[in-house]
Regions:
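Repeated loop/turn-to-beta-strand initiation elements of outer-membrane beta-barrel proteins
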Residues: 2, 43-47, 97-104, 143-148, ...
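Transmembrane beta-strands of outer-membrane beta-barrel pores
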Residues: 8-12, 39, 53-57, 96, ...
Length: 361
């Protein structure tokens, strides 16, 4: 089977309801196209492929800003963003006909991304080329009470960014392997333990374990626990484009190498509990859930906007950084076709900024 999906939108009329001289909504146009193919035979083989294309152009700033005459000039303030992205992805899988619990699969993707933007007098150009492959095999150990998944992965990620006439390049090559074991005790208890080993061309060996537990007190009530670690390379500019609109300088404090931005990878441990209860009241269904999660960073790229009125500083964490989250949610359908959701969330996010642990904005 095949499918072709398209989506387009645009804003072509300038709007300034409060008459402050700046556009209330950016002008722009966007086009998305997705083409999908799927194939499956009766022998257990399945495959899916997709081709995606995106183009997105935006303009913001003062009402009478003309990108042809005023771009990167002091005449009028303007913002322009031009993004193009192309992606090819695929999944291939085989389920053994006589052993449905056994399968092998391959996930592939390739992405080309191009961003040409300007924010007032600052120009930002970014290119990214990425490839990803993940080979997965799953089966059982003895009986279906003991299942496992294992496989190999590969990430190739190339970044080339230029901001304020400074160029930052990095090439990430990350081969990896993983193993995941699942134990299921009837319908009461499930445990999943996993371990990943990745070798980064710059940061070397990375070990990331994880554990998930689930206990069903009743068919309607269950408790989940999760714990694990992870790492990533922060993308300073792509993740903080909202700060480009200011005229402040970007400063990377005490870079430890010439690789990329010169900062260490972010690493964190996270832990969490979830309690879910499903119920019926007056013949109508509902559910209640409560969550508590904590994340502790052993390293983090800190974005400091308060140290100086003329700078935005980036530096490696020196001290504590954590996030605590508690949430309660009630879902109920008092009448047919009427859903009610009540939720409360409490967040406590703190980071060490140049020696002082402060709330993260």
């Amino acid at each position: 089977s095949t499918a072709l999906l398209t989506h387009a939108n645009g804003v072509f009329t300038k709007m300034d309801a409060n008459r402050d001289g700046f556009l209330d909504i950016p002008l722009g146009r966007q086009l998305n196209v997705i083409s999908r193919w799927e194939y499956a035979d009766r022998k257990g083989f399945e495959t899916q492929f997709a081709l995606k294309a995106l183009t997105d152009n935006r303009q913001a700033g003062q009402n009478d800003f003309d990108p042809i005459k005023d771009k990167l000039m002091t005449n009028k303030y303007g913002i322009g963003i031009q993004v193009k992205q192309y992606e090819l992805s695929g999944k291939l899988g085989y389920v053994f006909p006589q052993q449905k619990y056994k399968s092998i699969g391959l996930i592939l993707s390739a992405i080309n991304y191009n961003n040409q933007s300007y924010y007032g007098l600052n120009q930002y150009d970014a290119k990214q080329n990425s490839i990803y492959a993940n080979l997965i095999y799953q089966s059982v150990i003895g009986t279906k009470l003991h299942k496992f998944r294992t496989g190999l992965s590969f990430i190739g990620d190339g970044h080339d960014e230029t901001f304020a006439s400074k160029n930052f390049k990095r090439q990430e090559i990350v081969p990896g392997a993983f193993f995941e074991y699942t134990y299921t005790q009837t319908e009461k208890f499930t445990a999943i333990a996993g371990l990943r080993l990745d070798y980064h061309n710059q940061y070397h060996l990375m070990i990331t374990p994880r554990l998930n537990l689930k206990y069903n007190f009743t068919p309607e009530t269950n408790l989940r626990f999760s714990a694990g670690s992870g790492f990533r390379t922060a993308n300073l500019f792509a993740e903080n484009t909202g700060l480009f609109v200011s005229s402040r300088q970007y400063t990377i404090v005490n870079p430890s190498s010439n690789y990329g931005y010169g900062l260490d990878p972010e690493k964190a441990w996270n832990y969490g509990l979830n309690l879910t209860h499903k119920f019926e009241l007056n013949g109508q269904s509902g559910s209640f859930s409560a969550d508590a999660y904590r994340t502790v960073f052993t390293n983090q790229v800190v974005v400091d906007v308060d140290a100086s009125s003329r700078e935005i500083r980036f530096y490696d964490l020196d001290g504590q950084s954590f996030s605590n989250s508690i949430q309660a949610e009630l879902n109920y359908e008092p009448w047919n076709k009427l859903d009610v959701r009540l939720a409360y969330r409490w967040l406590d996010v703190q980071t060490n900024y140049s020696g002082a642990v402060l709330q993260k904005p």
